[in-house]
């Protein structure tokens, strides 16, 4: 009616959601999309007998993580898959990483994702990941830095080790701002750089961060290849509704890497304790299958291999995932979606803007009958090419978790 406020799509979806006993499983193969090397992408080069067996029973298509031509970070691309508009809900990597390793944060705290990196004598970053140092070495360096630098200009600083070269840095004090540029060139072969405040109010915070970077690099001179630090994703805890509030779901997450656990926790998922292997993640899914109605299962190895430019390694990771597929299907979820959060072609050694293939299984799909789970096969599916933001809607619909819209 005239004069009435028009509901947004998000509000409509929330009004249609109902709670049922159907089980939804979203399998995210991180960075699964690729580009051809000698005529084949990583998915096309992989030997995947189980994908080939199950794919004909699915409906398929291609999804754009954020929008046409935009290369997404892992945060925005996952948010979209979970049903959150990444342009509306912006969550910094620092907060995601911090929550993923159970670091307590207040609304005043500023968190950043950190890398130990290798700096040459000319101030050039020659390896952003310091050769992927062992996690044990990471813990040793973090303990050293934590004792060496406890505060800068009255701001308390805590460092927390992650996996391999990764860590989380938390600044605690009043008036800290998160509108800062990344202190990370994002590519090897470029000069190390500090952060800049994007507002007048953020300049003081930028000064504190840059002083920390200088002191940390001086302290790490004898720790080659981990002789400097890079920081990005400066962020504070945002306001965001939970998946339970939005979709009437009881969601749980199974992921081995902190960032993904942190993002899942932010949207209200229960974080399930799991092991480090794909097999252990699937065993966790089995163990808790009766307790929740939505499961997010994350597999990381494909993305790591892609970022390393390791085409064969990514193919091997895809084949490893293929081997555990029957165990997931054996659980008989009412809806199963298999896709990626973004593409990470080994030829680019980074995330890219290319769409990801998706398979959707339920009792209510019209199977496409495709022979393989690849970019080329999925582009001909009846789902077509659509935004990742709509994946959760399709899953809810196929799980009979949405009421009819309108009269």
PLM regions and their residue ranges:
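Feature captures the catalytic ectodomains and active-site-proximal regions of enzymes
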Residues: 2-407
């Amino acid at each position: 009616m005239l004069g009435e406020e028009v509901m947004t799509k998000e509000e409509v979806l929330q009004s249609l959601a109902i709670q049922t006993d159907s089980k939804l499983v979203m399998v995210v193969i991180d960075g699964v999309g690729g580009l051809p090397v000698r005529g084949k992408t990583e998915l096309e080069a992989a030997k995947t007998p189980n994908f080939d067996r199950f794919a004909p029973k699915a409906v398929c298509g291609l999804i754009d993580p954020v929008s046409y031509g935009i290369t997404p970070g892992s945060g925005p691309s996952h948010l979209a898959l979970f049903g959150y508009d990444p342009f509306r809900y912006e969550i910094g990597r620092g907060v995601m990483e911090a929550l993923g390793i159970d670091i307590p944060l207040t609304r005043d705290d500023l968190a950043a994702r950190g890398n130990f990196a290798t700096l040459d004598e000319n101030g050039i970053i020659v390896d952003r990941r310091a050769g992927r140092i062992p996690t044990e070495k990471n813990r040793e360096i973090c303990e050293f830095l934590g004792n060496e630098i406890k505060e800068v200009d009255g701001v308390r600083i805590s460092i927390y080790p992650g996996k391999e070269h990764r860590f989380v840095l938390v600044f605690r004090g009043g008036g800290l701002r998160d509108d800062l540029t990344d202190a990370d060139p994002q590519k090897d072969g470029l000069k190390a750089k500090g952060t800049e405040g994007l507002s007048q109010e953020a300049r003081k915070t930028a000064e504190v961060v840059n002083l920390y970077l200088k002191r940390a690099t001086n302290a790490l001179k004898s720790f080659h290849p981990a002789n400097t630090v890079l920081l990005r994703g400066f962020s504070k805890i945002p306001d965001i509704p939970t998946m339970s509030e939005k979709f009437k779901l009881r969601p749980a997450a199974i992921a081995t890497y902190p960032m993904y656990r942190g993002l899942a926790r932010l949207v209200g998922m229960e974080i399930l304790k799991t092991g480090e292997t794909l097999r252990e993640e699937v065993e966790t899914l089995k163990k808790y299958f009766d307790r929740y109605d939505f499961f997010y299962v994350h597999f990381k190895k494909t993305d790591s291999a892609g970022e390393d430019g390791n085409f064969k390694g990514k193919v091997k990771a895809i084949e490893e995932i293929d081997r555990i597929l029957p165990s997931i299907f054996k659980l008989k979820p009412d809806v199963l979606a298999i896709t990626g959060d973004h593409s990470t072609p080994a030829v680019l050694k980074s995330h890219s803007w290319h769409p990801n293939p998706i398979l959707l299984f339920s009792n209510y799909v019209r199977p496409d009958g495709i022979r393989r789970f690849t970019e080329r096969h999925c582009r001909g599916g009846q789902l077509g090419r659509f935004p990742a933001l709509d994946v959760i809607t399709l899953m809810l619909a196929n799980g009979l978790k949405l009421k009819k819209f309108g009269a």
